[in-house]
């Protein structure tokens, strides 16, 4: 059965960018599986870091995210 959904232009463009030769259904299915997998990983590692360690990791991840976004923007401007 086919269903129609409404998504914003920016979401459509992002899906279009990552889909390659896959169908939108395949891409969405992969993203949903990935999300579920991440949830399972989080359940397994919950509680292994102290609050201080968690805050440090969180800070570093935010820094890395910013660096990655800058790198990604530099690639799209080429």
From Swiss-Prot:
Keywords: Toxin-antitoxin system
Highest rank taxon of the organism: Archaea
Function: Possibly the antitoxin component of a type II toxin-antitoxin (TA) system.
Annotated HAMAP family: UPF0330
Sequence similarity: Belongs to the UPF0330 family.
Pfam families found in the cross-reference section: VAPB_antitox
InterPro entries: Put_antitoxin
Protein name per UniProt: Putative antitoxin PF1222
UniProt entry tagged with the keyword Ribosomal protein: no
Record organism: Pyrococcus furiosus (strain ATCC 43587 / DSM 3638 / JCM 8422 / Vc1)
